[in-house]
Amino acid sequence: MFREYKIYKFFEQVKQETYKVFWPNKKELIASTLVVVATVFIFSLICLVLDYSIHNIMQLLLTIGK
């Protein structure tokens, strides 16, 4: 019985905390999403360029050694 009370108390506290959460409006949510998508795109391009460069450098070094 004590265990059931602890579970009940836990979920009551969770419910209380959800009322304290700041929920963004649609405009803020869209702006944040665009920032995340743009950041991921930029870092993906950086990784692509670095990967391509390292690949070409390694190919050059391997062909020089032959």
From Swiss-Prot:
Protein name per the record: Protein translocase subunit SecE
Record has Transmembrane helix as a keyword: yes
Gene3D superfamilies given in the database record: Preprotein translocase secy subunit
Localization: Cell inner membrane
Pfam family, one: SecE
Keyword field: Cell inner membrane, Cell membrane, Membrane, Protein transport, Translocation, Transmembrane, Transmembrane helix, Transport
Molecular function via GO: protein transmembrane transporter activity
Functional summary from the UniProt entry: Essential subunit of the Sec protein translocation channel SecYEG. Clamps together the 2 halves of SecY. May contact the channel plug during translocation.
Recorded family membership: Belongs to the SecE/SEC61-gamma family.
Keyword Transmembrane helix in record: yes
Membrane-spanning residues: 29-49
Annotated GO biological process: intracellular protein transmembrane transport; protein secretion; protein targeting; protein transport by the Sec complex
Gene Ontology terms: cellular component: plasma membrane
Gene: secE
Membrane-protein topology: Single-pass membrane protein
PANTHER family noted in UniProt: PROTEIN TRANSLOCASE SUBUNIT SECE
Subunit structure, as described in the record: Component of the Sec protein translocase complex. Heterotrimer consisting of SecY, SecE and SecG subunits. The heterotrimers can form oligomers, although 1 heterotrimer is thought to be able to translocate proteins. Interacts with the ribosome. Interacts with SecDF, and other proteins may be involved. Interacts with SecA.
